[in-house]
């Protein structure tokens, strides 16, 4: 990472990374002390400014048998980061989108309720697909099924909550495309 950050290409991997003109994703894995060194932090920031995508490390038991930050991201996290880069479309980038799904429950008393058969199973992949396309997704649901933490999810129960959160989310979404600040 440090060699790449200062442009040293003394092996095939670094030569390819420096010569490639597309998006490069980096999933760091190192000891906490290495990760927290100012030179490593500086080079990671420099690489991210230079249009390299840095996938966040995890805090857990490391190879050196100490607990701390520096473990490589889980394969599923790397998969989603790569998928998001490959699937993103300019039209959807930073565009606010509201997706709702799942059946609401109207309580009659402490034991009984009225509901419907809506599972929310279709809304989940729609929200995920829009996220992977680059949209800023607000997902309002009664049933969150294994979605990304990056998806802003509001869990609700009844139709009144659904209506209120939908109105608020739509009001915010109408403001248009998000402008993400540069470093």
Predicted regions and their residues:
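Short beta-strand segments
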Residues: 27-29, 98-102, 141, 179-182
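Short, electropositive alpha-helical surface patch
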Residues: 41-57, 148-171
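Short, hydrophobic alpha-helical segments
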Residues: 82-86, 170
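Phosphate-coordination loops involved in phosphoryl transfer and adenosine-cofactor binding
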Residues: 21, 93-95
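Short, glycine-/small-residue-rich phosphate/pyrophosphate-handling segment
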Residues: 21-61, 67-82, 138
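Helix-loop-strand module that forms the ligand-binding subsite of alpha/beta enzymes
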Residues: 1-36, 181-183
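Glycine-rich phosphate/diphosphate-binding loop of Rossmann-like nucleotide-binding domains
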Residues: 41, 45, 95-158
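Glycine-rich phosphate-binding loop
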Residues: 1-9, 156-183
